Amino acid sequence: MKKIKKLIIACDGEAASGKSTGAKLLSKKYNLLLINSGLFYRYSSKKIIEKKPKNIINFLKKELNSISYKKISKQKLHSEAISNHVAVLAKNKKVRQIINQLQMKIIKANKRICVEGRDIASKILVKNPKYDVAFYFKCDLKVAAYRRWLDLKKSVSLKEVKKSLSLRTKI
């Protein structure tokens, strides 16, 4: 079978719906670079929580410009505090623009890539470059809450996780 030279796969969907699992399987099967766009928001939230900058826009421009995706992906970014902060941060239009520009830079630099994240197919990879294949993941709230609760190693109650996901799904 001939290897496809250019392939952009987008895995979009709701919080805790299985996007990451699906994207990992696809990137492994087709030997693609895997980018989890949510990690940019999680990393940004972690740094904002730690450093408490006065101007988050300038802070994030500098912070995200000076770190590689590889380093971001190795951080511990799945805590309830970070998840709750991401829900607020993701509503900031300027923050989304900064993170989207960074994602586009990475995507344009790689011909074979699988990008996973909310709005990646519906708003981000709609042109230049546009995805070749897109998947949308949807999951029942009870199942999504249980999946996230397991990810959090049961450190918070299932009820709290369900409430948090319910709020995040509305973003």
Language-model-derived ranges and their functions:
Residues 39-113, 119-125, 142-146, 159, ...:
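ATP-dependent small-molecule kinase phosphotransfer cores
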Residues 27-37, 50-53:
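Post-Walker A helix-loop "phosphate-sensing" segment adjacent to the P-loop in P-loop NTPases
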Residues 14-17:
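ATP-binding Walker
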Residues 126, 134-148, 152:
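Glycine-rich phosphate-binding loops of nucleotide-dependent enzymes
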Residues 1-6:
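Phosphate-binding P-loop
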Residues 20:
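Walker A/P-loop
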Residues 9-11:
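Hydrophobic anchor at the beta1->P-loop junction of P-loop NTPases
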